[in-house]
């Protein structure tokens, strides 16, 4: 039995009347240390405390571990079939744990949530097995692929905004070449960057979202499928047959490449949210004019790609899950569901948006970002409002597959392997390791 009113304790949570009185255990990794400067963890702890204060008859037992320790401990508990009442489920464990009966099927519960219409459905992908949902995606998401460009430099080149097609980027190269600067800076020295910060989004432009979901589900999709090979072919073309990138893209890291942009030696840079925060902070302190000219854009669309031209890869790696054993006590289950819905709901999303310019599962309208500078506001809109989401490849499947693909990608980007060979090796690793 639930009747809702609002209580404000550090932040607003729905104060639902819960019949349960007793212990409820939650295990998570948002330590006090983790929450220092980490908006997602701070928001999680803040809303969790507000929910706890709103329900004095429930004894909320928190088991809080550092992230690395959490991953080890939760795996140990899962192996012993001794998971806590409520815990954070990592996406890559969903399929196996669902098959083992370790996590509750929350499909109907999630669809009955009072916040369901506000949920960003794209975030549920890692926590699906077939059509079933096993968790409420939690904490905050950050993009892995953003084009950061100097609006003034591109204006001088004849573009009011960053080009929406690679063809126009290639045309702009001629202008920037005459200026003695690179068109776009990129660093793949660590081998993972070409996957996380480029192919994961470019691939979506060719394959669409269902293909990668099928790959996750072992539903028949293959790395050797024509659409994915086309994405590899375009990647090789852009890096080996055009001159739009810095020559040393395969030997320098993203940290090196972003310095080319900061120094003005490149007119744009492609990287992730971690690069954006560094670039913005550095330029804000050192070059206010260049800081104010920061612009954000999605990857340009290839000429032969037919899928969503506005996609960028962003996701939430964990979800709030519930131990099926909790269902033995319906009142306790209602409390666990209420907790899961509140720590991922509008109270959390509003808090992280207004305090950190971040977003979570629940979309929030009319967020007041006025206290943030324009660049921060623009990046919030890029990340959560103005673009569509696709998956971060290496958040799924397993590292053995991506180690093979990443190594071969780097070789391909040196012109020493064909896209077909890369695809065949990736498929072989997939079949052997997943």
Task: Report each predicted region and the residues it spans.
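Extracytoplasmic/periplasmic solute-binding protein
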Residues: 129-140, 145, 170-220
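C-terminal capping/gating helix-and-loop segments adjacent to ligand/active sites or protein-protein/ligand interfaces
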Residues: 217, 314, 355-365, 377-434
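Conserved N-terminal structural module of periplasmic/extracytoplasmic solute-binding proteins
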Residues: 1-99, 115, 421, 425-434
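Glycine-centered hinge/linker elements that transmit conformational signals in sensory
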Residues: 173, 217-249
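Hinge/lid segment of periplasmic solute-binding proteins
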Residues: 12-16, 66, 91-146, 170, ...
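Short, solvent-exposed loop/beta-turn-alpha elements that line the ligand-binding surface or hinge
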Residues: 107-119, 205-230, 282-289, 301-311, ...
């Amino acid at each position: 039995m639930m009747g809702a009113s609002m209580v404000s304790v550090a932040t607003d949570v729905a104060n639902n009347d819960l019949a349960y009185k007793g212990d409820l255990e939650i295990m998570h990794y948002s330590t006090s240390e983790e929450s220092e400067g980490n908006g997602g963890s701070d928001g999680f702890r803040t809303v969790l405390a507000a929910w706890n204060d709103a329900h004095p008859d429930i004894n909320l037992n928190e088991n809080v571990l550092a992230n690395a320790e959490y991953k080890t401990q939760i795996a140990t508990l899962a192996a012993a079939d001794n998971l806590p009442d409520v815990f954070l489920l990592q996406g890559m464990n969903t399929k196996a744990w669902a098959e083992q009966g370790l996590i509750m099927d929350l499909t109907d519960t999630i669809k009955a949530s009072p916040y369901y219409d506000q949920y960003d459905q794209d975030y549920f992908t890692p926590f699906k097995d077939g059509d079933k949902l096993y968790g409420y995606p939690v904490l905050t998401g950050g993009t892995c692929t953003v084009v950061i460009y100097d609006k003034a430099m591109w204006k001088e080149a004849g573009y009011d905004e960053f080009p929406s097609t690679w063809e126009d980027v290639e045309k702009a190269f001629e202008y920037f070449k005459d200026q003695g600067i690179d068109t776009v800076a990129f660093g793949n020295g660590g081998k993972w960057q070409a996957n996380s910060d480029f192919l994961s989004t470019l691939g979506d432009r060719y394959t669409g979202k269902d293909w990668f979901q099928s790959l996750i589900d072992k539903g028949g999709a293959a790395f050797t499928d024509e659409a994915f090979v086309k994405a590899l072919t375009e990647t090789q073309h852009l890096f080996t047959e055009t001159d739009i990138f810095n020559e040393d893209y395969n030997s320098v890291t993203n940290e090196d490449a972003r310095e080319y942009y900061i120094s003005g030696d490149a007119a744009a840079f492609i990287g992730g949210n971690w690069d954006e925060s560094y670039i913005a902070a550095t330029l804000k302190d050192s070059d206010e004019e260049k800081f104010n000219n920061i612009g954000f854009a999605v990857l340009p669309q290839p000429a032969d790609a037919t899928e969503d031209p506005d996609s960028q890869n962003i996701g939430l790696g964990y979800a709030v899950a519930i131990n099926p054993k909790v269902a033995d006590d319906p009142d306790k289950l209602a409390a666990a569901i209420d907790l899961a819905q509140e720590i991922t709901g509008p109270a959390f999303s509003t808090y992280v948006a207004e305090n950190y310019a971040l977003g979570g599962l629940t979309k929030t309208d009319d967020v007041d970002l006025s206290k943030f500078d324009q660049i921060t506001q623009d990046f919030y809109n890029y990340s959560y409002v103005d673009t569509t989401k696709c998956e971060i490849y290496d958040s799924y499947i397993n590292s053995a597959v991506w180690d093979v693909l990443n190594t071969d990608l780097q070789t391909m980007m040196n012109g020493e392997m064909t896209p077909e060979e890369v695809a065949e090796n990736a498929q072989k690793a997939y079949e052997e390791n997943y």
